[in-house]
Structure formats: structure tokens, C-alpha cells
């Protein structure tokens, strides 16, 4: 505390001492109009100077002062004297009044209007306001007239060390790569001090580390934090806490200080190689496992993190490199061993692999710590499994002639059980692929035989599936596709490729080609088709036509002469024999129809029918047939119409002569007949003068008795029917005795109290005695017919 007090006193008196030292030059160099000097609140009267100096410095009027200073945070028992105002016009007779105005006048600073002394009446804070500008003026005490123009002066607040440094952005976080060299910059921090940075050392800061050595250091003036130790290892310690101090007064004793924290995190670098947890791995896998199945996982641990710990796995050696593969799982950072090709326990029972794990991202700065890879041995044991039969071939292709005999052997399939037990195999045909059951197979030896005749012309290929099943385990089955090709034999005779009809002009020339025909054969010989054409033996010397074989395997028919007459013979039939080149050859006879037609001079056919001579000009046989068909259709329509007109439907209701109508209403009469007594009378509707305004209900007895209502006023003749109906509608709507039509009507008591009972009550009967309807005859003539229909007669009783 004594040291602290001495420093504060030193800060207080330092400016006063400096001002005192510089005082004589200021006095001698003062202008001629100055009569008094004010220094730091302590005025120096000119009366204390020599007589000569007083004579030189006298003036009629004027202010003399420098800047005034006042210490901040001063809290004495009395107001602190800041300075004194004085003018050379003041002889000391107390006839001059001093007035102070400006910043803080009257509130912070107070002036003695007689002596001119200025006092600070409040505690000042330089950090809030560093200086105040005020105006001083001397006026006559009695008249208040200004004696001199006002003058401005400044009161500056002197700083003291009353604010500690602050880290406004703390606490801090920073990162630095592990294994960094000595002196690597980590970050920098900044503290601020609210004291005056110009005056004294109150705002001069010095930084230091309170906690965090020996790992980090700090520049005292720049606050740059650096590494103090090289090669710090993240795997040993990842995070460090550093406490930083900022102290003012240049770090000297008695200065104020502030602290903050810095958390330094070491970031990872790839400085550690991967390492397998074990040098030997054992896995087992069934021989029937599906391709691509994961057999096992191997993992190489890496102390690094992130991408620095990523490793790729490879199979670099072993006797199963072709059967197995390994893939890297970036998520789990391990290697997955999968099956690439099928396994066979009977062939090889175990495999040995050498697996390598290598870092993907290698930092060349740490290559000397390598190699960044590791190897391990993987032992895979194949387990025996009950496998399905294996065919000797993945597919089979068989050929058979279409004329093969039934039950003849087409081919054979073979299969075996690959297991050591070697179970017997049973063969069968998947009938979904042989719906017509054209083939059979021997269940023991797999020989395929023909069950039904084949026809290559219907189907050339037959694709069936053969099933092989183990006898000891029926769940073990295998399938193989078998394609059977039907080979052709010459079993179809050739024939015309289409229905040919030749036309011959009456004015044709000898040797003219009448028609060119071609043949087709459903068979498919290996060397292609070759047809032979000839006429029947009895038609070889045909006087009218001859044939000629063409190079394209077609046939041309030629006329031997001209002068054909269609009136003598309209149609000629020419039988032609067509033979193929099969072994043995087959042949057929096709007949060509040749019509004689009338042609124009240029050979265009115009008419080929004899009827053309007897038909009307311009009307062909087709047109006559169409006309006749239309006439027949019209006759059918007329007959149908007449038949429908003559047809009469029997009436739905049979009228009985003995029908006694009495009160029965016949609704087949429009309007209800004579029983429709409630119909509106149009005359009454047109003249409703005498109608009573209220018509009581006759079907029910009202619960309450109402007084007779006043009748409606007479309306003039010719009133509109619509108005009358609206009045009646209003009466019906307001009738309290009328039940609502939307209410539930109960018919459960219908017919009760009647001797005959309800007609609508139907019930099941258990015997013929229950069906006695004799009482219907007692109901009167209306039910006589009904009683005859349902009464039990004597004949019925006898039966």
C-alpha cells in the first residue's frame, strides 16, 4: 500500500512540477495585455514580480491563463480548487463580477463571482469526459454590463490508473497441429485499458502466461502465443488450458491486471500407422454360401482420427485370391472379406489369405515413422453342406427326326451328387415346360424318350426343363434346360403357293404367257427346294395349253393357239403335277382354272362372264344381287311390322263377371271413376264465397275442442285458383289435429279385433291343416273367387 500511494502522488504532482519548471519562460514571453497567469489552479500574482516587470506587462484590459487541470476521481471533503479567473480591470474593489458558462458550468464547476475561484463540486471520470470547454466573462457588479469580451478556456481531466485491462473477446479457443515445431504461432489475444494511453503508463499493457507452461509462451507486448515445446503428441494429450494475464503500468508493481483463458486443441496429423489387433484371423464358411456373402471382418486400429485413420484393405497373397475379395468399410474402418466364386468342400477344405491394411492419406513429413501399413493372416475353413445335384452340362441340345418312333430315345442327361455321401439321383420333367407331354424321361438314368408324334411343321423347337432330385433329401434339386430340335423329313408334298386363277383373252396370241405360278413345300430340305412340274399323262398332248419351267423354280402356262371363244367354252381346267426333290420325292396335283375373257385391243380384260351378254347394258351380276338383297330385307321389315301390329297383349287384370264392385275402386280408370268424389269442382274453386273457412278432420277425433273460427271474408268472383289453394295450404299447415307426415306410423296392430284377422299377417305353416281358407267364403261375393282358389275340396282331401 505505501508503494501504491507513492505512485499515485507521483502521478498527481508530475504535471505540476513540469509546469512549475516551465513557468519563467512563459511569464517573460507573455503578451503585453496579460495581467495574470493561472497555472493548474494556482494563480501567480504580478505583485510578486519586480517593479520593472510590472511596468512592462501592464495593459488596460485582458485575460491571462493556460489550460486548467483537475484530477479525476478526487473525493476530498471540500470541493477541489481548479483555478482562478482574474482581469487587470479588477482593482480589488469587489465591483467586478465573474460569470462562468459552458460545459458543466454550475453543475460540475462552480465559480466564486467575487474572487473568480473555480471549484469542481463533483467527482470527475476521465473515461466519461476528458475535457470541458467553458467561457469566462467579467461584468460590472451593479450594472451587469460586460467589461470585456468573453473568453474560452479548457479544463482537462487528468488520468489516474483506475481501470484494469479487459479481454473483451475471451475466453479464446485455438488449434495447432500436433507435432508442430518449436515457436509455431498458435493465436494472439488482445486486452484493452480504458485509461489514457498518452499520459503515463496507465494504459501500457504487458502480457504473461500464468498457467500453461512449459507448453506455450507469449510475446509480452504483441500477445502472440507460440508453442514452447516441439512435437506435442495429440494421442498423449489433446487439449491444453492456458491462463493469460494483461497488466498495465508496463507490468510494474502496483499496476492493475486482467486475465483470460485460452483453450488450445491439438489437431491430428497422420503420424501413426495402422495396426491389426491380431496377427491371425479364423473364419469358417459353408460351401453352399451365396456369392457376395460377407465371410468375416478384419480391422487395423489407427490412433489417428478422421481421414488420417482411413485405411484400404487388400489381399496380397494366399491360395484363395481368386475365390475371395476384400472391401473397405469407410464407416467402420474395417475390411470385409466376401466370396467371389463358389466353394467346393470336396475339392478344397481350407484357404489361407494374407491381408494388408494401408493408410490412404500419408503425410510425407512423417514418412520416417512408416511404413504406414500392416499385414495379417486369415485362415478360412470350408464347411461341408448338402449340395444339390450337379448336371454334367449347364444346358443340353438334342436333335430328333420328326418321324422318330414313339418311345425312341432322343438323348440323355446326367447328374451327380457332389457330396461325399453321393446320394442317388432321380430325374423328372417339369411338366410346366411340357404341357402336351410329348417327352418322357427315365427316372434312373436320365434317358429322354418320345411320347407323342412330332411334326416339324408345327413346332421346330421344344424347350423342356429336367429336374434332378436327391433321393435321400428331396429338398436338394437342380434344374437344367434341354432344347430339342425337330429335324425335317420329306413328309409334305408341294402345292401351289396360292389359289391361282388365270385369264385368257379371246384375241390372245399363240405362245402368250397366260399365268406364272409358283409352288411351296412345308418341308425344309437342307439344300433348299427344287420343284418339277408336269402335266397329267392324258393331258400331255393338250391342244390348248402348254407349260414351261422357269429358272426361279416357277412355272409359266402358255396358250398354243388363238381364237378362243368364251361363248363356246368359258372355263378350262389344267391339272399340273408338282414334285419335290426329297428322298423319296413327294408330289401332288394342283388344278389351274383358266377363264376366257373379252379384252380390248391392247389386252386389257373387260368381261369374263357369259351372263354379260344377257344382262342389261351397264348392270352387272353383282349389282343385281345387291338390289335383290335390298328388296328381301325390305320385305322382312314389312312382315315384322305387320306382325307386331296384329299382336295384342293379354290384360294384366282378368275381369270377372261376378265381380261385385260395391266400394272397390278401380284404379285403371283415369281419375278414379265414379268413386273419385273428392275431386276439385272448378266451379266451386272459381266461386268460394260460401265455403266454410275451416273444415274439421273426419278421420280422427281431436284431443282439444276449439272454438269455431271466423269464416273467411268473401272474395270477389273470379278469384284465382292459385290463391284458393294457398289458403287451403295455410289451413292444413296450421291444423293442430293433423299428424306430421314425417312421423313414424305404427302398423303393428293392424287387423286386431277383426274376426277374419289381418290379410297382411303372413306366417309359416307346419302342416296342411294350417292352410284352411274356408272362412274366405263367408266374407261375401268379393272374396268368393279367392275362396275357391284356396279352399280344400273333397278331391283334395281324398288325395
Curated annotation (Swiss-Prot):
Sugar attachment sites: 33, 57, 188, 463, 473, 544
Domain Cadherin: residue ranges: 62-167, 168-276, 277-391, 392-494, 495-616
Predominant cellular place of this UniProt entry's protein: membrane
CDD domains in the cross-refs: Cadherin_repeat
Subcellular localization, as worded in the UniProt entry: Cell membrane
Molecular function as annotated in GO: beta-catenin binding; cadherin binding; calcium ion binding; identical protein binding
Keyword Transmembrane helix: yes
UniProt domain comment: Three calcium ions are usually bound at the interface of each cadherin domain and rigidify the connections, imparting a strong curvature to the full-length ectodomain.
UniProt protein name: Cadherin-8
Native organism: Homo sapiens
Species classification: Eukaryota, Metazoa, Chordata, Craniata, Vertebrata
